């Protein structure tokens, strides 16, 4: 770092360009004077001249990384000096844009804004810079390269909470009333409240409320009551809530040993569901029910229907049962020649070299929005090459209409490692990361969980202390530290007496914590891990466990590794924690 002393900066005229070189202090040569003769009068005490206080030193960055650090720290003068001093290159417009748009940064004049936009109209911040120019007096909006609309390109099947029925005030009021009963596991009062309003609700609203009441009975182990409520009130419902009620009725029938009713209800789930993962689950469990009823002729067709969802939890279980391929096709090799020379791609490469990964990812995402749809596979290949897993995941799941990306690209496998090395299988950590953050290293949840594995600062501090490591909250944004704390928490959950080294319970503990998993040891699952998963009271954890396990199996398949937990679950046996290879 170079230090400039701006002792006389206050005496210089203000510059309008925030990036102009900082003024240098002026030195005035002393004037020679003829000494005056001394007087015989008593001498007065000399008046002391005011002390000259030097202006604070400004540190001039010697690298672009230091410039970006200065901007984030609010050291505006330092950042300005660095931008002015460093050689002008591809990163210069990025640094200027970051400075100009940073909250609290010095007001930039119109000429500087217009100059930057003209130089780099393809920047991600170009639109914001153009709007700033208008507020500074631009008579016309500066020309930029606009973003084009993007759409979702598809994702792995997943379970999610069904949308509440809308447009019925009575249903809204009942939903709020039932919330308290669900939390208290108070099935009797929940059903009583529902029956008061049932005559005034639509068929779908009745099915929604009945499903919630039935679920309380199911969690309490009162399977007859759960099936009674779900079966009766799903009549006449269409689509999502009818299939949700059928699902609970099917699970209750299965636990009651009624394979005929279970087969019928699970078939209804598959026929009327709208969620791909739930449809596959309906087919798979219907096959189990038919097998339990000794009707093997019906089993294979149902398993094949489930297996058609090749990237789903139950689809992969069905494929393993049928003995068909459980591995996704690998992603094709793509040439990047068409995009290598694009300014934003070149900037991404340079930014990644200096560790500015978030900015590098932003360059690639923005290029996908302003460029040709045909370029997206090459942009994704660049992201993989640069280890920008967050950009890879985004480019695999978002793009302009018409973009086609292989499903395998939705499973980034960056060459990252925890600071103390891998102690859990990397595939398992990455399987969690997809569900936790979609590989966004800067992600922060409303609850304060941070980074790739959504680690809470308090938990990370505990893990760091246990390992004899120093801890800084900012380290959670660093993949190597975030992975370290995440895998340490997985290890702790594995050692917990509540999980018994059983993989589904370890995964559940990562999401819900060990104490709830300990309470769930009383779930009447008949030793069946799939039934245990589907009976977990927390909906988020109930959907989280299959998603992480599916991700793990896909990673193992793409790496041509064995899939031991898939094989064991297909045999309805509890899988243990995977070993590190």
Cite the ranges covered by each PLM segment.
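Alpha-helical segment of the N-proximal tetratricopeptide repeat
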Residues: 61-78, 164-192, 213-216, 220, ...
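Compositionally biased, proline/threonine/alanine/serine-rich low-complexity intrinsically disordered stretches
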Residues: 7-62, 139-171, 180-183, 574-580
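Catalytic glycan-binding domains that act on GlcNAc-containing polysaccharides
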Residues: 97-99, 110-119, 123, 132, ...
């Amino acid at each position: 770092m170079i230090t400039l002393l701006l002792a006389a900066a206050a005496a210089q005229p203000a510059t309008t360009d925030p990036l102009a070189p900082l003024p240098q202090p002026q030195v005035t040569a002393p004037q020679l004077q003829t000494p005056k003769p001394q007087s015989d009068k008593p001498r007065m005490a000399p008046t002391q001249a005011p002390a000259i206080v030097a202006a604070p030193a400004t540190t001039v960055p010697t690298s672009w990384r230091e410039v970006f650090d200065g901007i984030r720290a609010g050291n505006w003068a330092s950042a300005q000096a660095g931008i002015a001093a460093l050689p002008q290159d591809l990163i210069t417009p990025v640094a200027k844009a970051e400075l100009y748009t940073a909250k609290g940064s010095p007001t930039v004049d119109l000429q500087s804004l217009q100059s930057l936009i003209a130089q780099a109209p393809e920047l991600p911040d170009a639109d914001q810079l153009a709007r700033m120019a208008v507020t500074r007096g631009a008579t016309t909006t500066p020309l930029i390269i606009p973003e084009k609309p993007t759409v979702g390109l598809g994702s792995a099947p997943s379970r999610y909470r069904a949308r509440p029925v809308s447009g019925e005030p009575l249903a809204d009021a009942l939903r709020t009333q039932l919330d308290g009963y669900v939390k208290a596991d108070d099935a009797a009062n929940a059903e009583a409240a529902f029956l008061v309003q049932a005559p005034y609700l639509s068929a779908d609203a009745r099915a929604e409320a009945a499903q919630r009441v039935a679920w309380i009975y199911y969690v309490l182990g009162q399977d007859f009551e759960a099936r009674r409520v779900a079966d009766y009130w799903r009549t006449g419902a269409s689509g999502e809530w009818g299939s949700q009620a059928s699902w609970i009725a099917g699970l209750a029938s299965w636990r009651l040993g009624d394979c005929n009713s279970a087969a019928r209800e699970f078939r209804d789930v598959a026929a009327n569901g709208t969620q791909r993962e739930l449809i596959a689950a309906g087919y798979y469990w219907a096959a189990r029910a038919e097998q339990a009823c000794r009707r093997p002729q019906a089993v294979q067709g149902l398993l094949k229907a489930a297996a058609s969802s090749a990237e789903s939890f139950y689809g992969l279980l069905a494929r393993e049962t049928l003995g068909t391929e459980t591995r996704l096709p690998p992603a094709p090799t793509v040439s990047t020649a068409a995009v290598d020379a694009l300014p934003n791609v070149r900037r991404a490469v340079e930014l990644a070299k200096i560790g500015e990964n978030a900015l590098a990812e932003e360059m690639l995402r923005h290029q996908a929005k302003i460029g040709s749809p045909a370029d997206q596979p090459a942009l994704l290949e660049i992201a993989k090459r640069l280890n920008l897993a967050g950009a890879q995941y985004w480019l695999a799941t978002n793009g302009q209409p018409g973009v086609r990306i292989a499903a395998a690209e939705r499973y980034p496998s960056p060459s990252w490692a925890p600071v103390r090395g891998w102690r859990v299988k990397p595939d398992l950590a990455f399987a969690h990361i997809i569900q936790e953050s979609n590989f966004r290293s800067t992600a922060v949840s409303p609850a304060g969980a941070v980074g790739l594995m959504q680690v809470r600062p308090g938990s990370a501090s505990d893990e760091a202390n246990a390992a004899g490591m120093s801890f800084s909250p900012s380290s959670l944004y660093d993949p190597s530290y975030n992975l370290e704390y995440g895998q340490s928490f997985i290890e702790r959950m594995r050692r917990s007496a509540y999980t018994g080294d059983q993989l589904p319970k370890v995964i559940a503990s990562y999401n819900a914590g060990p104490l709830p998993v300990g309470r769930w040891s009383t779930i009447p699952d008949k030793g069946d891990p799939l039934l245990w998963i589907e009976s977990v009271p927390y909906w988020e954890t109930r959907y989280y466990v299959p998603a992480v396990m599916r991700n793990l199996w896909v990673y193992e398949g793409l790496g041509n590794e064995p899939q031991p937990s898939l094989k064991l679950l297909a045999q309805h046996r509890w899988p243990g924690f995977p070993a590190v290879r």
